[in-house]
Design a protein with these regions (language model features):
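Extended, charged catalytic domains and RNA/DNA-binding interfaces, predominantly
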Residues: 1-198
Length: 198
């Protein structure tokens, strides 16, 4: 039984679903049997042991070294070359992502398009405009497991082809620079970055 109950006087008339961009492509590959990398040890782990893989995938996305120290269930392949933070400060993607993470970056376009389609499907563009949906995502900054997440919300349906993720932009300033580069007001794109759980 809750101690108190709070309810807004009127419901919100806007929403944005902000999924974590860091694993858009990785999860797409692991769940698509036609994708190169579907049979990789990491994807087998992802599908076979979802709870353990959640931890390992998320730690890999923030670039912590020595990830094999975490317990892995018996019979699961141990990945010895999980990403570590590079000398340039960037975080390489999982091995099945290919050279420079290109496979995962390409695969990330599918869930990102799904996000855009969902926002458009529920946007009331009638004169009544009863509900507004925004395209958005979460940039999951977590240096050394510190929580520096940002919700990135776009003002219109004009958005970058791929949202900048923490692996490519491992600092808020790098995120903002990448957003400025990929989301130009002259092209009808505008963004807002909102820190949360910082």
């Amino acid at each position: 039984e809750p101690l108190r109950f709070t309810q807004l006087a009127r419901p919100l008339d806007f929403a944005a679903v902000t999924d974590h961009a860091e694993l858009f492509g990785e999860v797409e590959i692991c769940t698509n049997p036609d994708a190169p990398g579907f049979l990789s040890p990491e994807c087998v782990l992802y599908r076979s042991f979802p709870e353990q893989s959640f931890l390992i995938f998320n730690l890999a996305a923030v670039g912590l070294p020595e990830l094999p120290q975490f317990p892995v269930p018996e019979g699961v392949p141990v990945v010895s070359d999980l990403p570590v933070i590079g000398s340039d400060g960037r975080i390489p993607r999982l091995p099945y992502c290919g050279l420079n993470g290109e496979r995962c970056l390409e695969a990330a376009k599918t869930p990102w398009r799904d996000t855009q389609r969902a926002a458009e499907a529920f946007y009331d563009r009638s004169d009544a405009c009863r509900f507004t949906t925004f395209v958005g995502y979460e940039w999951t900054g977590a240096p050394l497991s510190n929580n520096l997440h940002r919700n990135v919300i776009f003002a219109s349906e004009v958005v970058p082809e791929i949202p900048p993720a923490y692996q490519e932009t491992p600092a808020p300033e790098l995120l903002w620079d990448a957003l400025d580069e990929r989301c130009r007001e002259a092209d009808g794109c505008a963004w807002l970055s909102i820190p949360h759980t910082s």
